[in-house]
Amino acid sequence: MRKKLNVYEMRIKVYLLENIPFQELQNALANFVDSALCQCEELISFHEENCYKFYSIGTLWPVERGMTYRKEQIYTLTVRTVDPDLARYFSEILRNHYTRKIKGLTVENRIIPRKMISE
C-alpha cells in the first residue's frame, strides 16, 4: 500500500521594508525563509545539512514590471513542501517573521489537490 503524498502550500503576505531589485530577490526570499528555519534549534542542523529539503520557494506576486519590488508594498510569497511538520512550522513562524528587507504578515494554508496526468 502506497502512502498518500500531500503537497502543502503556504501563501505568505509579505511587506517590503526596502526596495529589492529583481537580481537580489531570490537571495532576499531565501534569507527570509532560512532565517525562520534557524529560529528552531532542531531545524538549524536540517538547514545546514547538504541534502534535499523537500520545500520550494516561489517568487513574489504580483510581478513588478520595473524590475524592482517596491518598499512599503504588500506581495504574496508561495512556499510549498511535502513535509507536514515543516508546513506547520512555516505556517506558525513566517506570519510574524521579519528580516531587514521583508516582514511576514499573514499565512494562508492549503493542500494542493491531486490531479491525474493525462496524455
Which ranges hold each PLM region?
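RNA-interacting cores
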Residues: 1-119
